[in-house]
């Protein structure tokens, strides 16, 4: 076998491989003979079909199969010999089989050689927060509102009231589609409506008819309404006030607390809030480290890996439609390309961090991750057992652990400053509520 390697562009390589033609001819001949022995054709006894008839019927297909096998086998031998690491399947271009040799070309991309740089330039502001009694009280107040009952009142509407109304919206005196409703129910302060709508209702009583003027946000989903000033004529048909449950042991029982009453509920709330906080803190630091790593290391990436990641993201997006995708057109790759490129770069860079630091997934860390995740379920032990019995899920969790370890390794060389933050402020930002 003779091999020549050519760099075409970027990470693309072209291998020209030449092998003795007799290698193919012998295999073709052997396969034709094998087919002749087992072929059953009309007019011929089993195993007595002439070679010429086999060649006529199956010769072309047999040669194509053998040629493909020879190219694949010799390609593998060639990349091992040349120490090349393909990032995707090769494209084979077979040449002529005339003469003493068979030559073919294999075109493919290789993985980039990643050399980590600028790790000491990564700047991380590490937030430090904890759950205190006031934070637990805020959560309890939220739970009270979620379990509130409502009753009609004869007074002006205030925040947190529920109201029923009829309304008609118009722009420049013309009604618009979706701007009219009857018996519409709304809780004031829920921010379901565009800015100014809910606050415009506060202070009005049942039976009031009034107008409010609002402006649709520039990022409103309906293109024809973006940035438009609108007028709504509203008739308030009912105002309902919230009756919040008392915070006591009976309230605790609403959340499945069988023993310990209110104190047990508060302890459970604190535990859940602490778990969510720790996850959010970890995610915040990880994102800063990853962003800094990408900024310091602009690497070339194989198109094949990006295309594969695009397909994964596209499939995930389609699944979010709940399986109702039969008649949907395929989502364009452009929607996912930027995210796919970022994910491929992160994977390659973190892979090099793991390799450089000789990291192995720590069993204790894997178990802690599983237990932490399982604690959010009603029966944590059942979830832990399910993970431990599923090889694929366990491998996924080991990958998560390795990624954590890689981020921690990068933190050691990063410029880290610690900043105290309040729980509510941090979590609002982390969840996009700020």
From Swiss-Prot:
Q: Looking at its record, which EC class is this enzyme? A: isomerase
Keywords, A to Z?
Cell cycle, Cell division, Chaperone, Cytoplasm, Isomerase, Rotamase
Instruction: State where it is primarily located.
Output: cytoplasm
A Gene Ontology term for the protein's cellular component: cytoplasm
Catalytic activity reads:
[protein]-peptidylproline (omega=180) = [protein]-peptidylproline (omega=0)
Q: Does the keyword NAD apply?
A: no
Tell me which domain of life the UniProt entry assigns to the organism this sequence originates from. Bacteria
- Cite the GO molecular-function annotations of the record: peptidyl-prolyl cis-trans isomerase activity; protein folding chaperone; ribosome binding
Entry's EC annotation: 5.2.1.8
Q: What's one Pfam family here?
A: Trigger_C
Gene3D superfamilies according to UniProt: 3.10.50.40, Trigger factor ribosome-binding domain, Trigger factor, C-terminal domain
Task performed by this protein: Involved in protein export. Acts as a chaperone by maintaining the newly synthesized protein in an open conformation. Functions as a peptidyl-prolyl cis-trans isomerase.
| Entry note about domains | Consists of 3 domains; the N-terminus binds the ribosome, the middle domain has PPIase activity, while the C-terminus has intrinsic chaperone activity on its own.
Q: Which HAMAP family match?
A: Trigger_factor_Tig
Q: In its UniProt entry, what is this protein called?
A: Trigger factor
């Amino acid at each position: 076998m003779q091999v020549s390697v050519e760099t075409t562009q970027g990470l693309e390589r072209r291998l020209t491989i030449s092998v003795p033609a007799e290698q193919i001819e012998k295999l073709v001949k052997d396969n034709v003979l094998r087919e002749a022995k087992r072929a059953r054709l009309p007019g011929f006894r089993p195993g007595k079909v002439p070679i010429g008839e086999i060649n006529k019927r199956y010769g072309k297909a047999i040669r194509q199969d053998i040629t493909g096998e020879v190219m694949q086998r010799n390609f593998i031998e060639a990349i091992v010999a040349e120490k090349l690491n393909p990032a995707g399947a090769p494209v084979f271009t077979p040449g002529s089989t005339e003469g003493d040799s068979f030559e073919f070309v294999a075109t493919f991309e290789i993985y980039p050689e990643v050399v980590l740089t600028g790790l000491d330039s990564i700047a991380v502001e590490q937030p430090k927060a904890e759950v205190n009694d006031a934070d637990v009280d805020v959560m309890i107040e939220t739970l009270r509102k979620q379990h509130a009952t409502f009753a009609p009142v004869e007074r002006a509407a205030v925040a947190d009231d529920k109201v029923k109304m009829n309304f008609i919206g118009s722009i420049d005196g013309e009604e618009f589609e979706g701007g009219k409703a009857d018996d519409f129910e709304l809780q004031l302060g829920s921010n379901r409506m565009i800015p100014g709508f809910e606050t415009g209702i506060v202070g009005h009583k049942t039976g009031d008819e009034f107008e409010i003027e609002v402006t649709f946000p520039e990022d409103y989903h309906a293109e024809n309404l973006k940035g438009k000033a609108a007028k709504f004529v509203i008739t308030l048909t009912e105002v309902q006030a919230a009756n919040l449950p008392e915070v006591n042991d009976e309230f605790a029982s609403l959340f499945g607390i069988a023993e310990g009453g209110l104190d047990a509920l508060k302890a459970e709330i604190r535990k859940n809030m602490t778990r969510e906080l720790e996850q959010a803190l970890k995610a915040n630091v990880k994102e800063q480290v990853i962003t800094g790593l990408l900024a310091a290391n602009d690497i070339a990436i194989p198109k094949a890996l990006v295309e594969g990641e695009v397909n994964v993201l596209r499939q995930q997006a389609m699944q979010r439609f709940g399986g109702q995708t039969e008649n949907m057109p395929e989502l364009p790759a452009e929607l996912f390309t930027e995210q796919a490129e970022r994910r491929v770069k992160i994977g390659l860079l973190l892979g090099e961090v793991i390799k450089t630091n000789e990291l192995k997934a720590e069993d204790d860390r894997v178990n802690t991750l599983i237990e932490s995740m399982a604690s959010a379920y009603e029966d944590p032990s059942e979830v832990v057992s399910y993970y431990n019995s599923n090889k694929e899920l366990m491998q996924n969790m080991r990958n998560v652990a390795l990624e954590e370890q890689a981020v921690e390794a990068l933190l050691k060389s990063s410029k880290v400053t610690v900043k105290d933050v309040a729980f509510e402020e941090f979590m609002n930002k982390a969840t996009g509520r700020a």
